[in-house]
């Protein structure tokens, strides 16, 4: 009987840990920290940039991909156009609110797709390059909060649990600088708490509009040795014409 009670108690502790949540005061503090990370970034309103990816997989040569992104962050509008390799030039993605399409310039057809779709053979998904000001409160609940250090930086360590189908992962842990709220590291987990992916942001650049993570490393934790390095360049924050966020724009590129 004592053994059975011990097993029941252990199971109860595991269940409690799996469903643990913070107080409403801590949750509000966490949401404000996450929103501060967005506010510190340069992506507000319209912007465009070049995204260069280097995909590394054991036993294979490095693969280079390049995209041009146009986004209107306050209206959930995004257009992404592949620039390289030449064989895939003109492929693209279009987002208008909750509708997301991929575009094939050879067939000239649009296909409904998901924000969770990967870019080429990389570890980067569409929602990694999109900037969404309503992401945190709408799609996550606060699971845990603590303070710690990451290298030389004091950080807030925040674990968020997905409450909608929008996030690509069931749970994500963020390591955020205390002095300037910027994400330095992110760990993404499955529903069974298996580490799926690690994101490192070792380099930020300061521009007049805010900070830009100009170097990002995404590691596939299921396939050791696989990673994608992302470099952001050619940033502009000028107002974009509405036609860029249309199917006709993608069709007209080829």
Each language-model region and where it sits:
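Mid-chain, structured segments of secreted extracytoplasmic proteins
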Residues: 66-106, 112
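A short, Trp-centered hydrophobic/proline-enriched beta-strand micro-motif
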Residues: 42-56, 77-79
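Edge/loop elements at the starts and ends of beta-strands within beta-rich repeat scaffolds
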Residues: 40-46, 206-210
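Sec-dependent N-terminal signal peptides
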Residues: 4-14
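Sec/Tat signal peptide C-region and signal peptidase I cleavage site
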Residues: 16-20
